[in-house]
Amino acid sequence: MKTRTLPVLIAAATSVAVLAACSGGTNAGSDSPGGGGGGSQTLTLASQDQGSIEDVVKAFEKANPGVKVKYTVSGADQYQPQIRTQLASGTAPDVMSVWPGNGNPAATYVLAKPGYLRDLSDQPWVNKLPASVKSLTEYDGKSYTALFGLNGIGAVYNQEALTKAGLTPPDTWTQLLDFCKAAKAKGTPAFALGNQDNWVTQLVLYSLVATTVYGDDPDFDKQMQAGQATFAKSPWTTALDKYLTMEKTGCFQKNPLGTSYEASQTLAATGKTLGIVQGNWVIALLKEKNPKGTFTLKALPATDDPAKTLIPAAAGAGYAVNAKAKNPELALKFVNFVMSPEGMNTFVKKQGSLPTLSDTGLAADPSLAELTKFIGSDRTVPFMDQLWPNPKVQATMLSGLQEIFSGQSTPGKLLDEMDAEYKSGN
């Protein structure tokens, strides 16, 4: 499947003006009497949007006097299996973060299939979504997820650190390796890598796969679905080799497996590295750690032809309503607020993303100029896992990448294991 309808959306969004996943802790609005049922004005919420959900909750409470939101924030690797367990046991909150498509344990297809999510097809914003985004909210023809932001993955550079090092962002694969060598020689590694959090392991690989795999074969996913291609006998092998070449060249700080996502943010924000390969959502978190810093997302090159470079870009995680929500009316009110101009703009401003709807009036963030350009010129591919048949493929990839970095596995073994999980189907 090719992302060939996104440019229309971005052109509209910018005329009036892209696995996500963040690490966090727990926070809560003050409770009100009465628990979550009946006439209660308390909404329960589980989120993975560290650094942005806080402002959205405040805005929602302000717009709805008397309403209080009790919410928790946690990282994707902890959140995804946890929310599935809570839904199965009947202890899940009213509203929760849910990912598009079918690629992880908290993805729309995975949670809607057993009946855990409320059908949102009748909500006013659903038919305003572009087809490429709307399809990822659906299971069996019904929409279940409020997707508010478009995100991209690439190299996010600390501009001040670059200037101090006297370096500029690379446009080709050869330049990238030279950039890493020069940065290492100056004592400031090119990129922070927080592979202690397993979801982070995929981001460099996805950035390389976008160009290496889809540049010459935009229909690779269709071939996989038809049984005509495999991970192990495709340019995925090249992309994975390039990932490890970056590691051997010194593109990352020492001990990525011992570095958390939170710690990697600090390295990039404070100039201990020149940047970080992440989604655009990290920009807001870097600015929190360094308010005076300037951070810019650029494509990560994988070949020596800049014209062939592609960026992974797609709708990020959104919000869904528990089919057994204790306060269903308030839950619907919240997801509709998320999809309103106020709610959507609050989210995308904090996350440094782009709105999924074109009528919010939001001006594009300058830090996303290259992402906006790539989407507008049809140079993007979906996040790879969103089109995989089950969450096991991604889970195998994430654990396997950690094992490769620890010397316990090999690229060939990992890709064979991913193929086996892919072929196992839904």
Q: PLM features: residue spans?
A:
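Extracytoplasmic/periplasmic solute-binding protein
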Residues: 144-146, 177-228
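Glycine-centered hinge/linker elements that transmit conformational signals in sensory
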Residues: 225-256
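Extracytoplasmic/periplasmic substrate-recognition and gating elements
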Residues: 62, 89, 249, 287-350
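Conserved N-terminal structural module of periplasmic/extracytoplasmic solute-binding proteins
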Residues: 2-107, 291, 304-306, 346, ...
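Short helices/loops that flank or line small-molecule/ion binding pockets
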Residues: 80-92, 110, 161-162, 181-185, ...
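Short helix-initiation/N-cap motifs at beta->coil->alpha
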Residues: 73-82, 173-178, 255-269
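C-terminal capping/gating helix-and-loop segments adjacent to ligand/active sites or protein-protein/ligand interfaces
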Residues: 351-357, 361, 369-423
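Hinge/lid segment of periplasmic solute-binding proteins
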Residues: 102-153, 296
